[in-house]
Amino acid sequence: MIDHTGIGVADVGRSAYFYDAALGALGMRRVMQIPENVGTDGIGYGRKYPVYWIDRYHPHSAKQHTAFVARSRADVEAFYAAAIKAGGTDNGGPGQRKPNYYAAFVLDPDGNNIEAVYRGD
């Protein structure tokens, strides 16, 4: 289980638009936002507390892969559709990857590999 993770992004506004849509499809929302005047302009997403952060990255930082827990196959499909519509790039559409692992992969606007996975059924 992921407690929290974070990535650096080139354009916080563009990425916030993407993650508002993609993570909104999984029932997540912005739960914390740090003003730029405190050294960053980070946004924390989650259901109750921030588990996923975006903030302005340093040019030499590595791209990330993060998997989010989905509540159903329908959530995986909603995540994928919302992420693509918000500017993401297909990196593996919704489908069964192995027994009890239904997932979809999207590259966010900065090339980070974002996954939604449902382990039920």
Q: What residue spans do the PLM features occupy?
A:
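N-terminal beta-strand motif that seeds the catalytic metal site of vicinal oxygen chelate
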Residues: 1-16, 66, 120-121
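Long, continuous compositionally biased terminal/linker segments
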Residues: 41-80
